[in-house]
Amino acid sequence: MSQYSQNQYAGAYPTPPVSTGPYVAPPPLGYPTNDTTHATVAPVETKSKGEAADGFLKGCLATMLACCVLDACIF
């Protein structure tokens, strides 16, 4: 058996804080709260829906053109 008693380790860990009620999970990240300590962030500049679709369409057309060129060169 050990020569040390359990009472000697009582000071190693602080006592847990007294609970004032049930645990409530914090809101998800990005969820607006009443906390005003954070600095306001400038709004992010976004593209309109047409501009984003235009880039996607150009990418698809470029890919199709590259496939056609490769197909013509190989066969």
UniProtKB/Swiss-Prot annotation:
Keyword set for this entry?
Cell membrane, Membrane, Nucleus, Transmembrane, Transmembrane helix
Question: Which residue ranges traverse the bilayer?
Answer: 52-69
Q: Where is this region: Disordered?
A: 1-29
Any single GO CC term annotated in Swiss-Prot or TrEMBL for this entry: nucleus
Comp. bias (Pro residues) = 14-29
Q: Name one Pfam family in it.
A: CYSTM
Tissues and organs where the protein is expressed, per its UniProt entry:
Mostly expressed in roots, stems, rosette leaves and siliques and, to a lower extent, in flowers and cauline leaves.
Keyword Glycoprotein carried by entry: no
The compartments listed are:
Cell membrane; Nucleus
GO biological process, any: cellular response to hypoxia
Topology with respect to the bilayer: Single-pass membrane protein
- UniProt key word Metal-binding: no
The domain of life for this entry's organism is: Eukaryota
Report the induction information.
Induced by heat in roots, but suppressed in shoots. Accumulates in response to cold, drought, oxidation stress and salt.
Family in the record: Belongs to the CYSTM1 family.
General function of this protein: Involved in resistance to abiotic stress.
This protein's assembly is summarised as: Heterodimers. Interacts with CYSTM7 and WIH1/CYSTM13.
Protein name in the entry: Protein CYSTEINE-RICH TRANSMEMBRANE MODULE 5
Query: Whose protein is this, by species?
Result: Arabidopsis thaliana
Q: Which gene encodes it?
A: CYSTM5
